[in-house]
Amino acid sequence: MGLSLAAYAGAALAEIAGCFAVWAWWRLGASALWLVPGALSLGTFAWLLALTPVEAAGRSYAVYGGVYVAASLLWLWAVEGVRPDRWDMGGAALVLAGAAVILWAPRG
């Protein structure tokens, strides 16, 4: 379980950082050199997501979706300086609950 959570959290950080690099170049006028670490971050994201111990890619992606929503709100607050509101937090709680059901449901 620890490796799974670490892989999902690392994947979220890598994807958000990679996407933000493109955002910074495209929307904020940052240098095109931002695209280099952005591409590396997105490659790291894919690699980390492949490490998750889930038997089907689609299920792994579904669980990751919940982690991504929560991590995006942390990024919003920590990096962009915008505090998430109660609707953001409520939505994140809902998707994390759904991700937990998908990840830990008994299958057999």
Curated annotation (Swiss-Prot):
InterPro entries given in the database record: UPF0060
Location of this chain's protein in the cell: Cell inner membrane
CC annotations in GO: plasma membrane
Keyword line: Cell inner membrane, Cell membrane, Membrane, Transmembrane, Transmembrane helix
Main location, first listed in the record: membrane
Topological type in the membrane: Multi-pass membrane protein
Positions of transmembrane segments: 5-25, 32-52, 62-82, 86-106
Keyword Cell inner membrane listed: yes
Classification via HAMAP family: UPF0060
Family in the record: Belongs to the UPF0060 family.
Protein name: UPF0060 membrane protein RHOS4_03690
Organism: Cereibacter sphaeroides (strain ATCC 17023 / DSM 158 / JCM 6121 / CCUG 31486 / LMG 2827 / NBRC 12203 / NCIMB 8253 / ATH 2.4.1.)
